[in-house]
Amino acid sequence: MRAVSVHPDAIVVTSLLWQTTATAVRAGDEAMLVDSPYFPEELELLPTVLAQSGFEPSALLATHGDWDHLLGRLAFPDLSIGLAEGTMLRIRERPGEAQRSLREADAEHYVHRSRPLALGQTQSLPVPGHLGLGEHELQLHPAEGHTPDGMAVFAPWLGLLVCGDYLSDVEIPMFNEGGSVEEYRATLARLAPLVDRAETVVPGHGSPSPRERALELLDEDLSYLDGLERGDEKPRLPRGRDDARQRAIHRENLTELG
């Protein structure tokens, strides 16, 4: 796990698994953690890393309901987690989904945990909407397409956009159960003006990108979606995202959307 300051009031922590990111944002004496790393050792170390940096969170957020973004409670079991209304609906309609998926991933990676995942106290957040942090407000924007639920979190006073599983420099657009190309395109359209206002864009997997690179990624993802809708079996994948794993994801996309 590595931690990088992208702003005096923002730290991005990156897991060794899939370059999964967690972002701590601060306003005055208050901080909030968005998403989570994966490995138990990373989650155990996370409270110390954030406390020593002055980012001890008072609450958690998750950009969407995929299991790898819901693990903050394992690091901070006493904190509530804020979820978009769509994510809350997904959790109610698919009880135990995140826990089952986590157990399967742990088995695949030979990972043992001292306790199971429990979401505990949750807060359903209207999206689009706002969420107070200190004297500022986080903006919550709809971000469906990768999954049927999701939100992007924009901190305008930091010029920071945390967009969930979009605009990744290591992963092509992918679609989990309930995702759709149409909604994915709509999310990219909503993200575009936010990227224009941002200094830094943090994807759910990969490295934080400056505005110019994030706009390039957005254009690349739109081009990829064009090929996907045409049914291209061997499309030209974007720079830095053309490898065996991403080719496999493309085949999965064709199957999921076919």
Go through the PLM ranges and name each one:
Residues 1-53, 57, 116-186, 190:
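Catalytic core of the metallo-beta-lactamase
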Residues 34-37, 58-68, 82-85, 142-145, ...:
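Active-site neighborhood of phospho(di)ester-bond hydrolases with catalytic His/Asp-centered motifs
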Residues 43-44, 48-126, 130, 226-228:
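Active-site HxH/HxHxD metal-binding segment of metal-dependent hydrolases
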Residues 55, 79, 136, 198-199:
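A structural micro-motif
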Residues 23, 33-36, 43, 57, ...:
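Conserved N-terminal glycine/acidic-rich loop preference
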Residues 28-30, 79, 86, 156-158, ...:
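Short loop segments at secondary-structure junctions
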